[in-house]
Amino acid sequence: MTLHAYLGRAGTGKSTKMLTEIKQKMKADPLGDPIILIAPTQSTFQLEQAFVNDPELNGSLRTEVLHFERLSHRIFQEVGSYSEQKLSKAATEMMIYNIVQEQQKYLKLYQSQAKYYGFSEKLTEQIQDFKKYAVTPEHLEHFIADKNMQTRTKNKLEDIALIYREFEQRIQNEFITGEDSLQYFIDCMPKSEWLKRADIYIDGFHNFSTIEYLIIKGLIKYAKSVTIILTTDGNHDQFSLFRKPSEVLRHIEEIANELNISIERQYFNQLYRFNNQDLKHLEQEFDVLQINRVACQGHINILESATMREEINEIARRIIVDIRDKQLRYQDIAILYRDESYAYLFDSILPLYNIPYNIDTKRSMTHHPVMEMIRSLIEVIQSNWQVNPMLRLLKTDVLTASYLKSAYLVDLLENFVLERGIYGKRWLDDELFNVEHFSKMGRKAHKLTEDERNTFEQVVKLKKDVIDKILHFEKQMSQAETVKDFATAFYESMEYFELPNQLMTERDELDLNGNHEKAEEIDQIWNGLIQILDDLVLVFGDEPMSMERFLEVFDIGLEQLEFVMIPQTLDQVSIGTMDLAKVDNKQHVFLVGMNDGTMPQPVTASSLITDEEKKYFEQQANVELSPTSDILQMDEAFVCYIAMTRARQDVTFSYSLMGSSGDDKEISPFLNQIQSLFNQLEITNIPQYHEVNPLSLMQHAKQTKITLFEALRAWLYDEIVADSWLDAYQVIRDSDHLNQGLDYLMSALTFDNETVKLGETLSKDLYGKEINASVSRFEGYQQCPFKHYASHGLKLNERTKYELQNFDLGDIFHSVLKYISERINGDFKQLDLKKIRQLTNEALEEILPKVQFNLLNSSAYYRYLSRRIGAIVETTLSALKYQGTYSKFMPKHFETSFRRKPRTNDELIAQTLTTTQGIPINIRGQIDRIDTYTKNDTSFVNIIDYKSSEGSATLDLTKVYYGMQMQMMTYMDIVLQNKQRLGLTDIVKPGGLLYFHVHEPRIKFKSWSDIDEDKLEQDLIKKFKLSGLVNADQTVIDALDIRLEPKFTSDIVPVGLNKDGSLSKRGSQVADEATIYKFIQHNKENFIETASNIMDGHTEVAPLKYKQKLPCAFCSYQSVCHVDGMIDSKRYRTVDETINPIEAIQNININDEFGGEQ
């Protein structure tokens, strides 16, 4: 038994010496005693290639490259293995989760956390950590019993010890964990004759766990020889760069002392790896205190990018340069990263440059459609058929793959389900999914066409097929009692779904099309699923378990599944993390993401046991645990050192100034340290570099076209652009090989989001030969022509959801107030509190069930909202009573409809207008309330409009003037046209155009002492004060509020009097009768102008900006019009907001309709 240690800094030939030594032994005696090379898992393939690719060897029967676990299996093959079943990672996790749930009531600290999946994962990691460092439950229990400690720490350790002991008891004599198998391996070593003849080499490690040190001790004791290779200069200082490997050397020395053998050290001081002085100087001077600056020869580069995406694009371009100009192969290049955000960027950017690569990392299977289907299926059962997991299940397209356009059918089903509030067992109600119900989806009245009917029948059939599969699954699972029964039921359900055949067919198609990686994913998905089922049966067998617990445990197992992808080719760029990737002797290594916070990154304790608790336990129990965060923090420089010394020829460091979430980032302090080692090592700012060297952007044909587009766009905006881009454009344009897609890019240069004006025929096809429209439609056009085109031309509708919208609330208030008003004939002043409550309850019972398929009775929240609506109605009726008490105007008509041809005697006639093209304009709508007052054979009318939103309960005469607010003038015009149908006198004049805000007022007080019941009632009444415009006629003023007198301001209408009895300018919103008529006439002209523009085919993305606000903020069509302030601001429309609308309207002439031209 001999022990050798090869010690030296990076690149000094330690591993080369080891490989040479092994190869010499193999050549001398190919069938001699075994040679074992122990390396980390991620290094074994690379080392095997070193032997396979040697032309003098072409492989080996004598040498094996193994990691510790594989070595243990090799010994077990010789001496016999354990009788227990080995637990996989997933099986261990599932068992511990189940134990935690069973023992939850006995936990002291973690009782509330036990129900969360993440807790069992943390607990599993902690138990595995204890096993790696040979800490048993007995160690924990003795420590807890013997030591005085904080209550929280004691409770924590007791909880962990409880689960740990229970776990050990469960697996005793039946199962074995990976860590326990290594202990068994140690016990088997003395029996192995093969091991006694073996030469052992250990390379690629920088630290070991306690159990691994015990294995090394056994190897030293029983093998013929052991050689360990460590990257260290032998300095044992805890602040040394090589603290971590020097700690390993110290442990090896202790083992040697215990075994009473000496270590034959061989120091390697000569640098062999690096081909130039730059890399040699970087390695030698990285950790020195006194810096020796030398001139940089260009083999070290530091790149600064604005964003991470720009950073990886530049790395891709430089890889192409290495391949094309330096004749490197892809396998000569490596990229090392630390920030996980870069993994996504590699997948999205490198394929654009046709760069083959392999990322040495495991990806979770949880987001694969098959796995998402299974997990959603589980959640459907767990959640009692809630809508979200059901929709996720449908959208995976796994159970619906047999349907043509299945994604479209699922989208239609989703729309219907969200509109009708389908959840729970309502999914099983076939009546709810009657095809006729789909006709009303998003539309109040619509008859299905034959194509639509066929489509919706397919939707219903698809839904039924999926429901049948879920019901079969639920039935099979509900009949099971033991875990084995559940696993069997699950597998049989998958066969019932025909999932195995479906997956194998898809796998074969992918293989046939050359997509081998995706095909391999399907294989691994299915094998992983079967493995989890096998693990469940192995661990729990015939143990009784509830279906709920089984599905929880099963889901825990699925969480552990990961893809392990084999490289698809040998010649590819190696990508890995700086901490784990094993890339040696690459010609060029790129270290990306070299930012402060990433390199070095702050190390924080993430285990259940804190660093302080860990240190206390180590000191008091005389054991060693995994390194604490402060120790790991000291090793950050070593991580950087190892990463940057992997290259032979060139090292490129890069960093970005902005993170993936838009946060600012700083350069790594290690880069400042590296820069200080060299003269003339400047940081290259990528945008500035490309500005000076535009040709450096032209490395890949497809990406060059994209960059060319950006350059030409800058040129169009009169920015200075290098002539090289104009030359590049001509070359690409004239090359049949390169110009594919160029026309499309060029068309984007002049894109300004401009719509096409509709022709006369198309306008009539879209809008009809006459315009039948509400006032709001015209107001919508004034907001933005494209909004009108999208809503009434293309008839685009937002998806209706089973939730109360603002307009629903307004409809409810209108319906309730109409119901009550008709019951009392508009005489609000007769109401008392008891009558208000009675009528409110009656109205709500009648109206609420009709809202959104009885939405307001669907949940506790909506039932609470119903009560709130009732409270608002009661408060509103109290205000209406107050207003009716002091007004001579009487409410006479409620929710009165108007149209060109009334359907009943109660409806009003709307005069037809005509566009400039001769197309009729038929306006329709509904007036909330019409109040009347008659004196001396003259009738005065008030238009009252209920608004549930404060913002819309204001009459802005400037908006009225410009046609942005047309409602009130239109309603007054309709009433004045229908005096006979309303039963009014021959002479009818406007009274007021008023808004009533339906709401629940909030009164603010500075302190409790300010609260006075009388004042509170007054303040509440003021919150319901009508707003709008009132006829300045004295008869109207007197009738609106009978209390009006000098120095009095009404609290029910916008009218106030000065001391002399004149109208107050501050407290009054009034206009004379002629002015009101002029506004009405101008409103008609606005209708004609707007309708004419519609029929002219205007569809511009041209929102009307008013008071610095755009209607786009509340528009649902932004995803269609793509309005962009950078492109469309020149088309924003504005109006002169400084005008006095009452003065401006005086230029309008009034025709005979209002009593002669004025």
UniProtKB/Swiss-Prot annotation:
Pfam families: ADDB_N (PF21445), PDDEXK_1 (PF12705), UvrD_C (PF13361). It is an enzyme of class 3 (hydrolase). Binds 1 [4Fe-4S] cluster. [4Fe-4S] cluster binds at C784, C1112, C1115, C1121. Keywords: 4Fe-4S, ATP-binding, DNA damage, DNA repair, DNA-binding, Exonuclease, Helicase, Hydrolase, Iron, Iron-sulfur, Metal-binding, Nuclease, Nucleotide-binding. One of its GO terms (biological process) is double-strand break repair via homologous recombination. Residues 269-583 form the UvrD-like helicase C-terminal domain. Its cofactor is Mg(2+); [4Fe-4S] cluster. ATP binds at G8, R9, A10, G11, T12, G13, K14, S15. Its EC number is 3.1.-.-. InterPro entries: ADDB_N, DNA_helicase_suAddB, DNA_helicase_UvrD-like_C, P-loop_NTPase, PDDEXK-like_dom_sf, PDDEXK_AddAB-type. Residues 1-275 form the UvrD-like helicase ATP-binding domain. The keyword Repeat does not apply. One of its GO terms (molecular function) is 4 iron, 4 sulfur cluster binding. It comes from the Bacteria. Despite having conserved helicase domains, this subunit does not have helicase activity. NCBIfam families: addB_Gpos. The heterodimer acts as both an ATP-dependent DNA helicase and an ATP-dependent, dual-direction single-stranded exonuclease. Recognizes the chi site generating a DNA molecule suitable for the initiation of homologous recombination. The AddB subunit has 5' -> 3' nuclease activity but not helicase activity. This is ATP-dependent helicase/deoxyribonuclease subunit B. It comes from Staphylococcus aureus (strain MW2).
